[in-house]
């Protein structure tokens, strides 16, 4: 509403909101940074680092970097500065795998802090349902999930069977 009012517009009362995000239902005994979880959601989590890098390259802006990820950002920036690609073309290497797969050298940057800071729906079915209910209470109507492409069928099926079937509508 604030953004609309700044440009002299009024949002309709039934304004539909959707968030592009990612999800992974944890298996018993599994943690947020297990290999399977990174296989399924690493590409989307890493896209945040790519975005932060782009902003930083554009104007040095680091205001969008979550405080909980500041050390991770420093490590990632050092990692990018050692890339073989010349600075003028480095964006091509930065975005390799962007939203489709996690580049093996970047997997170490997928941390619990990054997942939480970027809104990932990662947890047990009950935890994910709670996250969805909290976001719904804030006005979110829909989530669009983007898992890593080679894991999409399994990831989306798990979400459908273990979360959506139990989510109250």
Language model segments and positions:
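An alpha-helical appendage that flanks or caps ligand/catalytic pockets
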Residues: 2-134
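C-terminal helical cap(s) of enzyme catalytic domains, especially alpha/beta-barrels
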Residues: 2-6, 152-169
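A structural alpha-helix within SAM-dependent methyltransferase catalytic domains
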Residues: 129-136, 160, 164
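Structural motif
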Residues: 138-140
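Histidine-centered catalytic/metal-binding microenvironments
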Residues: 147-148
């Amino acid at each position: 509403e604030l953004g609309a009012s700044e440009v002299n517009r009024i949002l309709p009362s039934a304004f539909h909101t959707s968030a592009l995000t990612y999800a992974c239902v944890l298996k018993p005994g599994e943690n947020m940074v297990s290999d399977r979880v990174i296989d399924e959601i690493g590409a989307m989590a890493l896209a945040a680092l790519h975005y932060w890098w782009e902003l930083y390259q554009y104007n040095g802006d680091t205001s969008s970097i979550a405080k909980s990820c500041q050390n991770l950002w420093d490590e990632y920036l050092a990692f990018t500065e050692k890339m073989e690609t010349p600075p003028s073309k480095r964006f091509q290497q930065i975005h390799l795998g962007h939203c489709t797969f996690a580049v093996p050298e970047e997997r170490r940057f997928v941390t619990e802090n990054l997942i939480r800071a970027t809104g990932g729906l990662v947890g047990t079915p009950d935890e994910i349902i709670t996250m969805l209910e909290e976001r719904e209470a804030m006005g979110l109507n829909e989530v669009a999930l983007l898992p890593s492409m080679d894991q999409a069928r399994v990831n989306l099926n798990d979400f459908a069977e273990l979360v959506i079937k139990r989510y109250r509508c």
